[in-house]
């Protein structure tokens, strides 16, 4: 299986039914092409936005929980200590867009791409995003 870093925006989009995020997770559930990985802090980020997600989502609490469980079962959380050695390189590449440094450092460590809808991130490092 190929590794693919997933950012919090993709997880949120899958719950909101925006874009193709949920479809990608559903297809991967069948095809098993990717091992999705994310920094451990992604769940902290997700929880920060949970009330906003609940307001914007057209899903019931039960449906949202089901989707979140389905998505999170496919994502392996990686400890910061496993990719700390790539953080300075990621920060240098991203310059003033430091909020995504963990995702890039993880992608650099695993030599893989990033699944993200962040336009600025894509512009700064199109080779990986």
What are these regions (language model features)?
Residues 6-7, 37-40, 95-100, 118, ...:
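Histidine- and aromatic-rich ligand-binding microenvironments
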Residues 12-15, 89-95:
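Short, flexible loop segments at the rims of nucleotide/cofactor-binding pockets, characterized by
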Residues 18-20, 59-61, 95-97:
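Short gly/ser/thr-rich secondary-structure transition/capping motifs
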Residues 104, 108-129:
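Acidic, PIN/NYN-like endoribonuclease modules and their adjacent C-terminal/linker elements
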């Amino acid at each position: 299986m190929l590794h693919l870093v997933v950012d919090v925006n993709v997880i949120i989009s899958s719950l909101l039914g925006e874009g193709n995020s949920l479809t990608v997770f559903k297809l991967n559930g069948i095809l098993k092409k990717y091992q999705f990985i994310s920094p451990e802090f992604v769940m902290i980020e997700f929880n920060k936005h949970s009330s906003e997600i609940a307001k914007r989502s057209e899903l019931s609490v039960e449906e949202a929980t089901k989707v979140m469980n389905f998505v999170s079962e496919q994502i392996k959380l990686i400890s910061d200590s496993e990719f700390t050695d790539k953080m300075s390189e990621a920060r240098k590449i991203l310059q003033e867009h430091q909020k995504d440094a963990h995702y890039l450092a993880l992608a650099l460590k695993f030599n893989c791409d990033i699944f993200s809808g962040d336009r600025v991130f894509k512009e700064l490092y199109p080779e990986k995003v």
